[in-house]
Amino acid sequence: SNDDAKIVCEVFNQAGEIAKAAGIKWGYHNHSGEFQKAVKEDDKGKRGVQGDIIYDLMLNGTDPKLVFFEMDVYWTVMGQQDPLDYFEKYAGRFPVLHIKDRSILGQSGMMNFENIFKKAYEKGLDEFYVELEGIRSGMTQFEGVKLCFDYLNKAPFVK
């Protein structure tokens, strides 16, 4: 619910204050579930109530000076959202990206990494991390990592 999201945001802000006092940053990494819609307690069970996307509630309910977001672009797409829309709407909130594809970067055809990187850099990206999961049969994790590295190393849009 919206009320639950508000509580989570309060906890995130408190954690961010504690982290800041210790000289470290506190951030959050999404999955696809954050792109579901939450509704107000009073609207639960009512027909036609659309609700708010949980991720938007989190971004709007947290202090950018205390909480950063590490967008997992794969799970954002799996949540039926466009990472570019989030970079535009919440510029500066994603200093870190979690780059992932269905398996090897650039091979699924479902992730437009060129547009993702270009817009992310334009809106404040500092660094990114790659996760490789769902490695196909017959390939070692090291071979998969090498293919991901090669893809990014050759990509003219990666700084």
Which stretches of residues belong to each language-model region?
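Active-site acidic/histidine proton-transfer and metal-coordination neighborhood
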Residues: 1-68, 142
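Histidine-acidic metal/acid-base catalytic patches
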Residues: 38-39, 43, 52-71, 75-159
